[in-house]
């Protein structure tokens, strides 16, 4: 019985490994952008307070993927953007631009009647493709952590995901 479990585990590992290699080679097919890395870490300091650390590395392959180069962060009376940094690199890996928190725009537009929600956003339109954009930010949740944020690394159609992780240390 133990040998069957070991064999089954090795078989699953081999299938997963070969499948992931195939997927890596196939990421550009029909893709306008690729999420090279999406990391979400939730660090809870109490039952009502937490820090949400986010990192996104997005490679925009062509003009059809330019919407994926933008940054958007929703905040409300329970959550606020504490840290932000961004960086844009060209195809050779040279830094084209660094983005600071002070460059983000804020809008309080809401489709509802009354809302405390507001958005931080940054719109970037590349002049040449491909470009790789890295965004790193921290959101402080306080006075009411009802649940953990959802994890959806793929934000648009025709977008591939190379690597993504969601961690909640205990």
Named regions from a protein language model:
Residues 1-6:
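Positively charged n-region of N-terminal signal peptides that target proteins for export
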Residues 9-20:
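Bacterial N-terminal signal peptides
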